[in-house]
A protein has these predicted regions:
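Short glycine/threonine/proline-enriched tight-turn/helix- or strand-capping micro-motif at secondary-structure
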Residues: 1-7
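Conserved Rossmann-like nucleotide-binding pocket used by diverse enzymes
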Residues: 2, 26, 59, 163
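Glycine-rich beta-strand-centered segment in the early N-terminal region that forms part
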Residues: 7-25, 37-91, 123, 128-131
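NAD(P)H dinucleotide-binding glycine-rich loop of Rossmann-like/cofactor-binding domains
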Residues: 19, 31, 43-46, 54, ...
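Cytochrome P450 core scaffold surrounding the K-helix E-X-X-R motif
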Residues: 28-34
Length: 164
């Protein structure tokens, strides 16, 4: 891992550019550094960079031409799940079941460990006002891990009891 200056990424029609105020740390960064279980650079060779980081909080800096929900200046939290946006799962069912699904900042070139990050607009959530930038950047990936375990592997249903 090294620090280097690169151009600010361009946004596509459904993308958002975010000024990163805080970035969360998780085990994806360790895997990326070790190249195990997969090499992040070999996984997506379309660009000669890999910016780690799968969680962030920040301020919307620029929006793509088709983005409707977000505007410049919005305070947001970014979660890690990228999806196709076109399949039935993405359009009303469960985006976490999308067959295209990728973990942003691990299975993609761009992540949160940069001054600016580019993400799909559907990855953004409003930043809770009562949370600091750091606290807001810390829960995205862990939330989706728990969600997938409870609703996927454990097959939890409405009305089931859980211990938190």
């Amino acid at each position: 891992m090294r620090m280097e200056e690169i151009p600010v990424p361009e946004v596509g029609p459904l993308d958002v550019l975010v000024l990163v105020m805080a970035a969360g740390v998780n085990f994806n960064g360790v895997w990326a550094a070790r190249g195990k279980p997969v090499s992040t650079l070999k996984m997506h060779p379309e660009q000669d960079i890999h910016i780690r980081g799968s969680d962030a909080s920040g301020i919307v800096w620029k929006v793509g031409s088709a983005v409707k929900r977000w505007k410049v200046g919005d305070e947001v939290v970014l979660h890690c799940n990228q999806s196709c946006g076109e399949c039935p799962s993405c359009n009303g069912e469960d985006p976490l079941a999308c067959g295209y699904q990728k973990i942003w900042g691990y299975e993609t070139n761009w992540g949160s460990f940069a001054q600016f990050c580019v993400a799909q607009s559907q990855q953004l959530l409003p930043k809770p006002k009562h949370l600091s930038w750091e606290a807001a950047a810390s829960y995205g990936l862990t939330f989706f891990t728990a969600y997938r375990m409870l609703l996927g592997r454990a097959n939890m249903q409405p009305g089931d009891n859980v211990l938190v």
